[in-house]
Amino acid sequence: MLTFHELIGFMSPKMANQILDDTQANNREVYRALVASIAQAQKMRPLFIGRQPKERRHKNFVQMLSRAGSEEHAGNLIRGWLFKEHKDVLTEFLGKLGIEHEEGMVDELPESIDDGPLNEAVDLLLEKYDRELVAVYLTAFNASNENRWENLDTMLADDERLQLHG
């Protein structure tokens, strides 16, 4: 039952840096918005933050995004990264569950999902993709879902394969 800012705090530094690196390289609009919001929160100019060495800047971003007040920015960053860099994970999960989507975009999710199909879909993702990526995706998916699926929350809390060890 992690929120987006908690997810940033619990993921490995390697994963957090990968998200920021990919976003900086491939989703400049989201990255610029992030720089502007961090600058405003720290009462600095965006130009000053942009001139910091990337390693230091990204470390500061992770610290800021891990705070409760950064939920919206953390959510935008993670969702944007998943849609831009890992659409295949989204489409495979939704497809395995039989949920209609358009390239990972869903108009309406079911209020709940049966355990059997959910377990099969999660097992499929874990067979094909990095364990931490799957945990980040499933956590983000449920955090974005208006009707959180209780069985997915339980699985994220109890299944050792889906634990974040940041």
Regions found by a protein language model. Give the residues of each.
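Charged, amphipathic alpha-helical stretches
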Residues: 2-33
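Acidic, low-complexity, intrinsically disordered interaction modules
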Residues: 25-151
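Short, aromatic- and cysteine-enriched interfacial helices/patches
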Residues: 4-11, 47-48, 97-99, 162
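Short acidic DE-rich linear segments
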Residues: 160-166
